Amino acid sequence: MSKGEEKHSMKTYRKYRFAWLAAGILALGLLAGGLMNVIADAKTKNADVMITSLDRVTLAFTGDLQFTGTVAEQIKKNGTSYPFTDVKPILARADIAVGNLETTLTTRGAAQNKQFTFRSDPRMAQAMADSGYDLVGLANNHTMDFGQDSLLDTIKHLQKAKLIPMGAGKNLTEATQIHYITKRGKTIAFLNYSRVLPSTSWMAGANKPGLASAYNPKGMYSKVREARKNADMVIVFIHWGKERMTVPEAYQTEMGHKLVDAGADLVVGHHSHIMQPVEWYKGKLIAYSLGNFVFTKSKMDLCNQTAILEVALNGKRIQANLVPAHIINGRPRLMTGAEKASFLNFIDRISPKATVKSDGTIVPSP
């Protein structure tokens, strides 16, 4: 058994143990007078949890993670688990949790000639694993901030923590690899690409370390079609768009639709540092950007507001839900009450092709 499989096996055991408990609760409900859709919170008072059937696969997605600056200061004071203390129950309850790592995890390399360069403590790889993450997207504009060695170090530290790095590798084959994970008889394919890179030198080559590029998307669409033949669900995790803009760029909409047309069931974006619309297109979901997640404070408060996207695959049906959070001192804290209602209303207003309900559920617009 590989290290990744070992971690998924342990996580599956925990999910099954919880699912048998859930089945018992539902059985009691039947005896009381009828089957209900039970929404409860098993681990925290601040978030909605769907108690699921044994054949249902649940996923959680977050936006940008980086552990530098004021975030690093808080980690030094409070430990590596600090950024995830409030959201760990949400991540851990998912069968598969995915995040975008917007930093290198290394102690070496020279800063590249760019405005912002991020280098974080390699111990944060294990902190992410301990918090519930399973896959980590590396195709973005920061994972080579300190050169090729910093990227390879980042991959090494993630793998040591039994996390699966996506969208990067020592060559193009590794960077564009489709990652398949099977849960409860369902095979899910994950692909990770970036449409935002500082230089073509960051693109992986036949014999060159680098990232999976979406600038020429034909190869990406081909990979999606390949994944479609081998998986029950195809997910594209993509870095794209314009910073601090709630409206997607025209190319995002075009590319998102073409990804679905090629076979993607779910497209999840990041890079804008701010939440962008959610959209149902041909029965498939596109979340254009999940914004920041673990990040330094922004002067623009909308950049400090984020959400975990929860997705459930039940048969061939996809259900989706947003769990809002507010980034305070570098740590996402779950929203409640009026703040949560206001945030979800905002996402609903900027999403003309979806309806976001007061409980965070995302459904097609009437």
Question: Predicted regions: what is each one?
Answer:
Residues 2-366:
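Acidic, metal/ion-coordinating pockets
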